[in-house]
Swiss-Prot record:
Keywords: Ribonucleoprotein, Ribosomal protein, RNA-binding, rRNA-binding. Belongs to the universal ribosomal protein uL18 family. Transmembrane segments: none annotated. It comes from Methanosphaerula palustris (strain ATCC BAA-1556 / DSM 19958 / E1-9c). This is Large ribosomal subunit protein uL18. InterPro entries: Rbsml_uL18_euk (IPR005485). The keyword Ribosomal protein applies. The keyword RNA-binding applies. Part of the 50S ribosomal subunit. Contacts the 5S and 23S rRNAs. One of its GO terms (molecular function) is 5S rRNA binding. GO terms for biological process: ribosomal large subunit assembly; translation. It comes from the Archaea. This is one of the proteins that bind and probably mediate the attachment of the 5S RNA into the large ribosomal subunit, where it forms part of the central protuberance.
């Protein structure tokens, strides 16, 4: 327990390894909404969040489970699903009159071509203004699912066409 004047107890979310408060402080000072991308074992979740004194407020959210409504038949946790979820998120954000955001990848490592950057690529291609470097985004072959179709052609089937048709269906939602 915290005994004595020199003992410091870190914040609970820091102790649990859930929040980097230094990075969070830098993102909040920017005074723009955050495009928060989180991965689970089964889904990709993208949210637009603003920080307020009472607590963070979610403005727009998109989950990769929603892709099934747009004709996507693949896994909801892979790179093409992240790309389509980012695109769906951008369409929802633009329809709700939120044209810009800054990327918040949380405790995920910033690795070239990662799923969080596939979601960023989908959002940027759909028209959301998010500052980024082009070199971090995954290649078009990966976001279309060509690497999956080449590895497992019997299971992936027509994944590339499925991703492209789902992307077209999502973009039709843009008002």
């Amino acid at each position: 327990m915290a005994v004595g004047p020199r003992y410091f107890v870190p914040f609970r979310r820091r102790r649990e390894g859930k929040t980097d408060y230094y990075k969070r402080g830098k993102l909040i000072v920017a005074e723009q909404p955050r495009m928060v991308v989180r991965k689970t074992n089964r889904h990709i979740i993208v949210q637009m969040i603003v920080a307020e004194m009472e607590g963070d407020k979610t403005l727009v959210t998109a989950n990769s489970a929603e892709l099934l409504d747009y004709g996507y038949k693949g896994s909801t946790s892979n790179t093409p699903a992240a790309y389509l979820t980012g695109m769906l998120f951008a369409v929802k954000a633009l329809n709700a009159d939120h044209p810009a955001a800054i990327l918040d990848i949380g405790l995920n490592r910033a690795t070239y071509g990662a799923k969080v950057f596939a979601a960023l690529k989908g959002a940027v291609e759909a028209g959301l203004d998010v500052p980024h470097g082009e070199e971090i985004l995954p290649a078009d072959e990966r976001v279309k699912g060509e690497h999956i179709a080449a590895y497992a052609p019997d299971r992936a089937g027509d994944l590339v066409e499925n991703v492209e048709s789902a992307a077209q269906t999502i973009m039709k939602e843009l008002a």
